[in-house]
Amino acid sequence: MKLNELRDCEGATKNRKRIGRGIGSGTGKTGGRGVKGQKSRSGVSLNGFEGGQMPIYRRLPKRGFKNFFSKIYNEVSLGRIQLAVDTGKLNIEKPVDMIALKEAGIIRREKDGVRLLSDGDLKAKITFHVSGASQAARVKVEKVGGQVISPEVVG
């Protein structure tokens, strides 16, 4: 026996039934959809309909709300920034902001801002222009002679 002589066993494969190909095919005319009504039409699926049973979105209570004023920040640890400095991806001559962090590959997409976290050690003297920083991160940055500049929060 050779590779080009391999075949499926008799009856292992079966041609699929083609729908809507005449009355004699067995699935012609209505094509297995029954007669009339919304479900017989094209492009219709009743999302959330569970056959008359009370749907899950009505069984469960309403909960919470979406705060449109909430901000989502990119959280960046000092250890990752130091790693980028060591590998030469981050230029520390200029102030480091969200755009510089994105170009260095530290953050993927720009959200509402950047927040520094104190995880890891920082050895380089860097000026940061960020939305916020944890208290411990500020202390670590200022300890090596750096600076954290963030906008004043009003109200």
From Swiss-Prot:
Record's keyword annotation contains Magnesium: no
Region annotation Disordered: where it falls in the sequence: 1-47
Bias kind Gly residues: ranges: 21-35
Entries under InterPro entries matching the protein: Ribosomal_uL15, Ribosomal_uL15/eL18, Ribosomal_uL15/eL18_sf, Ribosomal_uL15_bac-type, Ribosomal_uL15_CS
A single GO BP: translation
GO molecular function: rRNA binding; structural constituent of ribosome
Keyword Metal-binding (UniProt): no
One GO cellular component, as annotated: cytosolic large ribosomal subunit
Pfam families documented for this protein: Ribosomal_L27A
Subunit structure: Part of the 50S ribosomal subunit.
Family statement drawn from the similarity comment of this UniProt entry: Belongs to the universal ribosomal protein uL15 family.
Biological function: Binds to the 23S rRNA.
Name of protein: Large ribosomal subunit protein uL15
Species this protein is from: Bartonella tribocorum (strain CIP 105476 / IBS 506)
Gene name linked to the record: rplO
